[in-house]
Design a protein with these regions (language model features):
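Short, surface-exposed beta-strand/loop micro-motifs that present aromatic residues
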Residues: 26-29, 191-193
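Active-site metal-binding loops of divalent metal-dependent hydrolases
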Residues: 20, 39-43, 76, 170-173, ...
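Residue-level marker for buried hydrophobic side chains located in beta-strands
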Residues: 16, 36-38, 72, 201-203, ...
């Protein structure tokens, strides 16, 4: 394995947002040196999983004998699962990305899982994605319900380190979006909230404004899972990670802690902008918006909502683009940039680095 890099020995959090065009691939290295992967997008030019396999995974703390503590697929659209094959190996468990927590919107139809079932007739994907969808179904058919976050069992704790998943049961999403199949598929998205100290991040996948409002309102069929990496909190709430009960609501988290980093819903497109989300935040806007998207070359690509790119959509942070410091309201992968964000957990502001070469980003934290 070689010399353990500096980043693997710190109590900071590192969030990688990879340039995969119109798709999503995010990796969180928590302050406890555990890994959470959110979505498996890729591009013709870059494989996030190959980069992670070489540079990050060997140095992570194992969770239940797995190098990646949790893999999350927000929803089963092709641009979010193009590298799903990395989770599959001949014996089923040899992949370095194999996790004891494979997490996705439910698609089981038997017994107690039936109220969680996805309507696959309404999931629309482009031709050529059939193999990835089959792998998705095969892989997740064997996972253990209920949907969970990490079960905190460590002897180590980090103050104010926590994260949660929020989602709506698929049959309720079908009621919210009873006619538009694309909105139904996007509305299934699992939302991930991460907090370390005063720094916070929300990853909402491709969730629609209507579904996001339902989550914020705590409407029927809304589920939440939450892990606080603290022994006392864990003992006081032993089932926060696997049952919906008195976990904090997403709206209360946003109101109490604010939002440092918002990964824009649905690649920042105008159709995904949520006024309810902004009204729920402390100060009514995040510090910075991240847009994971490709360069728009035709009218069918849609338009990025201009509010994300101005002081109306964020308060702004100083970011390092290559070697140049700039104040930005939003950052994007569209110009070929990968993004690395550091939460120190002890104050200050998040550090944000952009570079076309992820190896150069790695040197920032080694």
């Amino acid at each position: 394995m070689g010399t353990v890099p500096k980043w693997a020995q710190t109590l900071q959090s590192y969030i990688w947002i990879f340039n995969v065009g119109r798709g999503l691939s995010i990796f969180i290295r928590t302050a406890l040196n555990q890994g959470i992967m959110y979505d498996f997008g890729s591009s013709q030019d870059f494989s996030p999983t190959e980069f992670l396999k070489k540079n990050i995974l060997p140095y992570l703390e194992a969770y239940k004998k797995c190098k990646v503590a949790q893999t999350v697929i927000s929803h089963p659209h092709a641009d979010h699962i193009s590298e799903i094959s990395c989770l599959v190996s001949k014996d089923g468990k040899n992949s370095p990305f194999y996790s004891s927590l494979h997490t996705c919107p439910h698609d089981k139809t038997e017994g107690s899982a039936k109220p969680e079932a996805i309507d696959w007739e309404r999931i629309k994907n482009p031709e050529g994605s059939e193999d990835n969808i089959k792998q998705y179904k095969d892989l997740y058919a064997s996972r253990t319900l209920p949907l969970q976050t990490i079960c905190y069992e460590s002897s180590r704790s980090v103050p104010n380190l926590e994260y949660g998943l929020f989602y709506i049961r698929p049959p309720v999403v079908s009621e919210i979006h009873d006619s538009n199949d694309q909105d139904y598929g996007n509305g299934l998205s699992l939302l991930l909230f991460y907090r370390h100290g005063i720094h916070t991040m929300l990853i909402p996948g491709d969730i629609t404004p209507d579904s996001l409002k339902h989550v914020l309102d705590g409407g029927k069929g809304m589920e939440k899972r939450y892990t606080v990496f603290d022994r006392q909190k864990s003992s006081e709430h032993p089932h926060w990670h696997d049952q919906s009960n008195d976990q904090p609501s997403l709206r209360s988290l946003l109101k109490n802690h604010g939002l440092s980093i918002l990964v824009a819903p649905h690649h920042g497109l105008e159709s995904g902008f949520s006024e309810d989300l902004y009204l729920s935040m402390k100060n009514n806007k995040p510090n910075l918006v991240v847009v994971s998207d490709k360069r728009h070359e035709s009218d069918t690509d849609g338009s990025i909502d201009g509010r994300y790119q101005s002081e109306n959509g964020a308060s702004g942070l100083e970011v390092l683009v290559g070697d140049e410091k700039q104040k930005q309201y939003s950052v994007s992968t569209r110009n070929g940039h990968h993004i690395l964000i550091t939460f120190e957990g002890s104050g200050g502001t998040p550090k944000v680095f952009l570079d076309s070469d992820p190896e150069r980003l790695l040197k920032r934290i080694e």
